[in-house]
Amino acid sequence: MRVLLACLLVCALVVSDSDGSNEVHKESGESNCGCLNGGKCVTYKYFSNIQRCSCPKKFQGEHCEIDTSKTCYQGNGHSYRGKANRDLSGRPCLAWDSPTVLLKMYHAHRSDAIQLGLGKHNYCRNPDNQRRPWCYVQIGLKQFVQFCMVQDCSVGKSPSSPREKEEFQCGQKALRPRFKIVGGQVTNAENQPWFAAIYRRHRGGSITYLCGGSLISPCWVVSATHCFIDHPKKENYIVYLGQSRLNSDTRGEMQFEVEKLILHEDYSAESLAHHNDIALLKIRTSRGQCAQPSRSIQTICLPPEHEDAHSRTRCEITGFGKENPSDYRYSDELKMTFVSLVSHEVCQQPHYYGAEVTDKMLCAADPQWETDSCQGDSGGPLVCTIQGRLTLTGIVSWGRDCAMKYKPGVYTRVSKFLPWINTHTRGEINLVL
């Protein structure tokens, strides 16, 4: 009873606010505490003049930095200060001040942690301007950056002013490439809006980039069968559209599950060549939607069934592939380069590939043998102009090394597989230019 009375007396003293020398707490300048969002710095006399932020309604945290009213994020979520704390798979986020996170680049002990929204909590944030809020998640023995289960405020809302609905127009680009680098050009999704980045899921939840692909309709991506032959289950893969950098968010990108994975029934691989190397992926978001058109997401036209680009036609190839086969990592940035089609007669010569090249394949190379598709570009697009429109002429399939003289890249000839595409998509794709 005495202990209880003593506790009650102390509590009464702490919460009272008398005048003069009996004052328990007082407001100080905000600079002493770093209070945000209208919080007031309060000094508690009976607790060794400890200063704390007194937060207004809807805010909490050491500096009033947490907005409890926020249930969605604006833009890319850089300013999001809500309380979402799980990734898209439902895994809990690690606290920003946990020992393992303190070893990462972004953590609660950074000098700019308050400005970035990082602190003694595990709420999702976007300190580095990725596509959406994220957090570190423990998967097995490692920590991974994972996007968070928090809603985009713009989803489901009508724009304040009416605007014309965007529609898919195959082969249309928003931008032209600009920055030259060795072996090609750094590009972005707005310049290659049909490019699909295909990732493979691993045990434990991590994902790694696998192959490229091309969006040929809102629900369908075409790629190469050899990318999936060792792991043919659709659940193993995630597809991103509108992505300009590997393992990093690009504003406007979309993530998809694979609803169907269709590998060519007659696919075969010899010592080097891949035959019938084509695959289809039917894609859906977690909400069951297909792709939506934007500046960074667009379909590529399919070729006429009986017409291909002529030899020496200048075409584009795109991907995150390696500069050299011996490179340890893929390119961090999406790249494109130009190659020219090599005639069938030339590519079948003995010092090229001989009889390994069939009429269902195309060859293309840089005339100076300096740029080429390489490992990691598999499944990606070879885009040529046919009848004045950018058209998916080939799919990156195989070749010997990268940019090796007399060994051009070999591509699946898309025009030879239009009936197969039509059969498996059940006529969902318009095959007429």
From Swiss-Prot:
Activity control note: Inhibited by SERPINA5. Inhibited by SERPINE1.
Modified residues (Phosphoserine): S160
Catalytic reaction equation(s): Specific cleavage of Arg-|-Val bond in plasminogen to form plasmin
Induction: By retinoic acid.
Keywords carried by this UniProt record: Disulfide bond, EGF-like domain, Hydrolase, Kringle, Phosphoprotein, Plasminogen activation, Protease, Secreted, Serine protease, Signal, Zymogen
The protein's name: Urokinase-type plasminogen activator
Disulphide bridges: C33-C41, C35-C53, C55-C64, C72-C153, C93-C135, C124-C148, C170-C301, C211-C227, C219-C290, C315-C384, C347-C363, C374-C402
GO biological process, one term: plasminogen activation
Matching CDD domains: KR (cd00108), Tryp_SPc (cd00190)
